[in-house]
């Protein structure tokens, strides 16, 4: 009888441990990699994001270099907008296309990704948002063959795998190497 009770108790403990381990893994948050201020000014942790989100940005930038404006538009969220380094707000894929076409016509811009950091942050409503912090070197060649470079930092908000929002900061007039 003692063996039956011991076996039953052992089985119960093993099952309880498995259930607890499975439950623990489901609720575990990814590592904290930094902090950020929410729109409401509250300091919130930044969590490591999904590495698979890097592919979205790589494809998006490749579409820029390929001048594939249809692909760019298809990768944008319905409510897409970007705030440029000069404060100009570009709202919608149509406005983005017009901006890009003019920029490319003037300077034959190409983009080279330097780095991408996927991260997640909780917004003021308690919902997790997916972001990419990115750095790109842009090379521009004007109609006279003069080359200049700009380094762009772009914070990108993703919404269901699409580009929803971007904030651009830049260092301009870098000497081409």
Report residues per predicted region.
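Extracellular/periplasmic catalytic domains that process cell-envelope and extracellular macromolecules
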Residues: 125-128, 147
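A mature extracytoplasmic/lumenal domain signature
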Residues: 76, 86, 136-138, 154, ...
